[in-house]
Swiss-Prot record:
It comes from Salmonella typhimurium. The active site is at residue 26. PANTHER family: NEGATIVE REGULATOR OF SACY ACTIVITY (PTHR30175:SF7), PHOSPHOTRANSFERASE SYSTEM TRANSPORT PROTEIN (PTHR30175). GO terms for molecular function: kinase activity; protein-N(PI)-phosphohistidine-sucrose phosphotransferase system transporter activity; protein-phosphocysteine-trehalose phosphotransferase system transporter activity. The lineage of its organism: Bacteria, Pseudomonadati, Pseudomonadota, Gammaproteobacteria, Enterobacterales. Residues 4-87 form the PTS EIIB type-1 domain. Its EC number is 2.7.1.211. InterPro entries: Glu_permease_IIB (IPR036878), PTrfase_EIIB_Cys (IPR018113), PTS_EIIC (IPR003352), PTS_EIIC_1 (IPR013013), PTS_IIB_1 (IPR001996), PTS_IIBC_sucr (IPR010973), PTS_maltose/Glc_sub_IIC (IPR004719), PTS_Sugar-Specific_Components (IPR050558). It is an enzyme of class 2 (transferase). Keywords: Cell inner membrane, Cell membrane, Kinase, Membrane, Phosphotransferase system, Plasmid, Sugar transport, Transferase, Transmembrane, Transmembrane helix, Transport. The keyword Kinase applies. The keyword Transcription regulation does not apply. Gene3D superfamilies: Glucose permease domain IIB (3.30.1360.60). This is PTS system sucrose-specific EIIBC component.
Amino acid sequence: MDFEQISCSLLPLLGGKENIASAAHCATRLRLVLVDDSLADQQAIGKVEGVKGCFRNAGQMQIIFGTGVVNKVYAAFTQAAGISESSKSEAADIAAKKLNPFQRIARLLSNIFVPIIPAIVASGLLMGLLGMVKTYGWVDPGNAIYIMLDMCSSAAFIILPILIGFTAAREFGGNPYLGATLGGILTHPALTNAWGVAAGFHTMNFFGFEIAMIGYQGTVFPVLLAVWFMSIVEKQLRRAIPDALDLILTPFLTVIISGFIALLIIGPAGRALGDGISFVLSTLISHAGWLAGLLFGGLYSVIVITGIHHSFHAVEAGLLGNPSIGVNFLLPIWAMANVAQGGACLAVWFKTKDAKIKAITLPSAFSAMLGITEAAIFGINLRFVKPFIAALIGGAAGGAWVVSVHVYMTAVGLTAIPGMAIVQASSLLNYIIGMVIAFGVAFTVSLVLKYKTDAE
């Protein structure tokens, strides 16, 4: 594969060198921010050698090349275009200017929660393992190993406000370590542990107001709102305080002001917001049942196209941290939608006689089965439309099933086949059945529907 030739072929189809604002890449895609998106010929780009798909998302033109290939294309492209290399964050900042308000909020929440996902996944995996061990009586819960593993499994959720405080402050333009400190204030030992409230808690009289001394372990919205406020306070103080005193007074006053406001106003309000969202969702799932799963599973992939799905991380983390819920009942539904995209995409492989399309569909379908759906959605299913519709139907069917049989997960971030690692032990079989339903329905509908499957 001639990467220099590929780069030279792409440039005129993207509107020329002058139309490239920035370039970056992820594991599979070349991410370009264009000055004028209308100058790009997406159909022609899709026909360039090595290109597995092309789509616009999050203010960027994203061209799918695949793992390993994209790095070499990127190096050749930046040289051919005569532009300096941009980091993903720089490209994202430029692209953000093109986003609508909803997409900006989704991007903001994504940037806050994605770095935390490994910690939540690790805790979720351990919770799932311990749940299985306890269910089948393999180890005595009083065993030292079990107790230590239990400590490891709950740690990420106990300090979740601290983790969020760090990443949120960085995103809001504040000092990440002050954000983490504020998260520490909200989980201070002087406050009754949020999961132990049933045993009772005390209140504090603050100038006539009775303040409930309840911690915010596992919560999301209180620390998000508190750190947003803290970042504003910090910026204002840095403008007002002389440089000679900035290092001492700014962090001191920021922590004092933000800490008081967080404990007295923002914390309780944020808890009410989070509990309200969790209550609405859990009520909808419990009362609408499989109909809610049908609706959510069918619409999830449509939401993915907009990029707003990244904001769901905050809601899911809130469900896990809520003492009255403690499980993620949304992620199994999203998992069914992702598997369905893989099934619909694989059907195209059986239908098409175009060698280039065949080369794209198989890895794209496999990727979707691992929970990464961009290549399947944008490279194949949306391209031919009807496979995408088939995937929506499959996702709806799978979503209806997992809700009707109460499939729950213990973490966020993993879907499809990898999601099996964080499914509750009692739900694992039904989760697998759900994947078979979603995949089978999407595959069958995509195979039966009539549509052209050539590169033209």
